[in-house]
Every structure is written in structure tokens, then in C-alpha cells.
Amino acid sequence: MALVSQARSLGKYFLLFDNLLVVLGFFVVFPLISIRFVDQLGWAALVVGLALGLRQLVQQGLGIFGGAIADRFGAKPMIVTGMLMRAAGFALMAMADEPWILWLACALSGLGGTLFDPPRTALVIKLTRPHERGRFYSLLMMQDSAGAVIGALIGSWLLQYDFHFVCWTGAAIFVLAAGWNAWLLPAYRISTVRAPMKEGLMRVLRDRRFVTYVLTLTGYYMLAVQVMLMLPIVVNELAGSPAAVKWMYAIEAALSLTLLYPLARWSEKRFSLEQRLMAGLLIMTLSLFPIGMITHLQTLFMFICFFYMGSILAEPARETLGASLADSRARGSYMGFSRLGLALGGALGYTGGGWMYDTGKTLDMPELPWFLLGIIGLITLAGLYWQFNRRRIESAMLSSS
């Protein structure tokens, strides 16, 4: 038992460093894409939104297949291959002077994520015990926030010189991450049985409760991805400089590093996962409604702060809830499918957000996209409430019988 505990402990440290590299490499590049192509080159927000949505759709929409392959062949080969593929996508992005090149680069980056993301998520479940999983997710989120602000700072600084440097730096970090995994990651099996890929896929698709939960989260992700598209654009417009975007990520990092872990420990003793997820989503939704009417940068940052507070409350609960519903016989497949809501929400959030932003500008109604996003948040909240309430009723009926 002592050896098992030691292996779990070392595995968690490995996951934390690996996660830092992945987050850093991603945020060096992606927050700057909308600034580079919309603000600097004058491309339509819809064109850039399509590129970002394509990356999201490819990575998360095909995640169930990446997870099923990892269930069959193990985590290590999929993680290393996927990270090298993302590095290639970032290198191609440096040459993007036509929309189709940007779309191709984002698709290649997303395909890499399809391969490495589900097995990495499944390893978290494998190496953590259920009672500590929520707090470990909080640590990962704190690291995500710190990596995001450091990555955005590096990317903003490099963008002053050349966008090529931004992309090459992101690619180099993912090559480093691939080497780290190839050298040190043991040949873990992420599921308790090594079943054919089709069996893992069908096991997930037959789990109606899990499928409903994942698809309901589409609306949640439509709100969440605006951190990468519309919020940076609005911050840049009000500030008059892309350098101000880094302060948006600095707010997230400061809130996450100071509040995320203690808030997770406090709330897990007092509220259910479902209550924490819905409360966080409600805060995120209400904070988006007024953004289109804001004319001062300080006020905008205040509402972005509220948005992040909602995310800090909701995210650990969302991850832990999804992990608790996963079948240990097909962890990779479950974690891959769990990203489908992010795929749909990301694709709709990016493309729809870009279209709504352009339409709002054309109609001289800057509040339009934010109002529509708020409505989507309320509809999602109602869907989650119905789903969780029905589950409680079914559990009560089973226990009484």
C-alpha cells in the first residue's frame, strides 16, 4: 500500500508539471489570435471565430475516439503524438496569411488535443482518490490560471515584435512537453479492462444520464469560451491597446490563486456538486448581460471579475461531477465524450459569438451578443436544474421502494 501511495503521489506531481507546460504553451498563442487577426490585420471576427471554433470542435468533438484509442493502447503514445501534432499546428499558424491556412493550423492543433487530452484527464482519475479529486482539480485550475496569465504575458510581449515568435514559442513548449512525457511517463493503462474500442464507445453512448449531462453543458461552454474571443476584443477596444488583455488574465490568476482552493474546500463541506455548478453558472450569466453597455475599462474589469468568480465556483464541481459519473472500465472513452459539450459549446460560442459581435457592430447594438449569451446561460441553468431535480426524484423513488 505504501508503494501504491508513493506512486500516486509521484504521478500527481508529474501531472502538475505536465499541465503547466500544456497550459503555458496554449496561452502563449491562443489569446493573441483574435488580437492579431481581427484588430491588427482587420479580418472579420466571424472568420477568426470559425478558426477558433474549428479547433474546439475537432479537439473536443473527436475526443471520444481519442479516448477510446487510449483505452486500447495506453496513454503514453497518444499523449506524445498529440503534443507533437499541436506543435506542428502552431508552427503552421505562423505562416497564416489566408483564412484557410489559419483554419488548417487550428484544425491540426485541435487534432493534437484530441489525442492527448482524454488520456491526460483519465490519468487524473486513475491517480487520485475520489475524496481528494475535487481539491486536485482545484489545484489544476489554479495552475491553469497562473499559466494563462504567464502565457498571455509572454505572448503579448512577443507580439510587439512579430506574431511568428508567438507561434514558434508555443510550438517549442509543446515539443518540450512531448519530450517530458516520452522520457518520464510510465506506460499506464488508464482503464481497468483493455476492451475493444467499439465496446468503450458503446458503453458511454448507452449511459443516458452521462450523455444528458454532457450535452446540457453546451450552453455553459458557449459562455466560457468568450474569454478567448469577445472579452479580449472588448478589452482591447476600451483600452486602445492589446497589452491590456494581459490584465484580464492577471485578474483570473489573482482570483484563482487566492480563492480557488480554499473556496473548493469550504463549499464541498456545505453544498452539493450540483448546487456549486448551478450557482457558478448563474454568476457567470448575470455578469455578461451588462458588458455591451460598459464604456469604462475599470467597470469592464469588475464584471470580468464576477465572471471569473462564477467560473471558479463552477469548474471544480463540473469536473468532479463528470468524473464521478464515469465508468472505470472505459475511463478514456468517458473523458473523451465528456468533451463533446465543450466541442459543441466552443464551436457555437466562437462562430456564433463572432457572428453576433459583427452583427451587433453593424446594427450599432454592442449589447446584442452579450444579451443573447445571457439568455443562453439562463436556458442552460434551467436544463441543469431539471436534470438534477429529476435525478433526486428517481433516487428517492428507488430508496423508498
Curated annotation (Swiss-Prot):
It is found in: Cell inner membrane. It is a multi-pass membrane protein. Its main location: membrane. The keyword Nucleotidyltransferase does not apply. HAMAP family: MFS_MdtH. The chain crosses the membrane at residues 13-33, 34-54, 99-116, 139-159, 165-185, 214-234, 243-263, 277-297, 299-319, 340-360, 368-388. GO terms for molecular function: transmembrane transporter activity. InterPro entries: MFS, MFS_dom, MFS_trans_sf, MFS_Transporters, Multidrug-R_MdtH. This is Multidrug resistance protein MdtH. The keyword Transmembrane applies. GO terms for cellular component: plasma membrane. Belongs to the major facilitator superfamily. DHA1 family. MdtH (TC 2.A.1.2.21) subfamily. It comes from the Bacteria. Keywords: Cell inner membrane, Cell membrane, Membrane, Transmembrane, Transmembrane helix, Transport.
